[in-house]
Amino acid sequence: MSDSQFLTAHGRFEAARRLPRLDPGHPAHGLHGHGFQARVRVPAHALPARPGAGVQELREGLSQALRPLQYADLNRLLAHPDDAALAQWLRERLGTASAQAAVELRSTPAQGVAGDPGGPWLSLRRHRFLAAHYLPNVPPGHKCGRMHGHGFEVELRAAGVDHATLDAHWAPLASRLDHVLLNDIEGLHNPTSEVLAAWIWERLRPGLDSLHSVSVLETGSSGARFDGSDYEIWKEFGLDSAVRVRRAAAGSPPARLHGQTFRLRLCLSAPLDRVLGWVVDFGDVKTLFRPLFDRLDHRPLYEIEGLDDTDTATLADWIFQACRAELPQLSGLRLLESDGCGAGVHVGAATPP
């Protein structure tokens, strides 16, 4: 399968709105406000930017599109400015990239919408529960074999339903999962993130046929997603590096020696191990990535042999190719700069990170 490169940008805006189509007693019917967050993703070829400047061009395009929304009364722009209407409004203002742009808009960290080009808007809702667990099938001495626990987060995505509907479907499961030992629940004898995501899917899908995916986050840097057929996990790493973009315009800030704090997400997809119940052990991902991590973290990246340049898109592709031998399950990666903008790669039809 071919690899596809993409660019991504992130932005924020503060705005007020009323949602008049909701029942008068609904809290969002009246005037209120949010700190919105928006993320867009486009294929790298969708922007006619000079080499090495794609991330900056998308960043500037998103910033310009968001400018009319900053500190605005959104009802002056849209009659019913819910998350989906705002996301569609934003997509239409991304210039040449609009037709190929995937957009995610969150009105709060726990709710929003996401949509790929030509697809429906998916409502997304995130819930949290506190639970203990242990993994009985790991090798002796593995830390996950000990009794421990997490503040788990679960993100549900579904088409054609609102956030209240997702909440209603989630509520019965929340009461079963919160403040318990997961291993005591039928079907969760070996409660890995992947097994838990599939367990939740199996209980929600019969009553929610538009369910798109279930993601389970054990920590802020790792998680698993199940869409009814495929499993994917991710593990994130922080990199602090020195960069200098050789192809940038002479005298411009990117051309100068400077620093960058990157956030790298590695995504891996494979059938579950029947005994261990995971795609790959998160700890193994960390161990196998460690030699490459040591070449990137607290290093001058412009000195790496074989790395053509240190712009984020070039660097993301180089890391992807460098990882494949040790991590054959790699399905994609995303490399973000300090402000949340960046680039990535995904394999074939795999969901971009």
Language model: regions and residue ranges:
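Charge-rich, low-complexity N-terminal segments
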Residues: 1-353
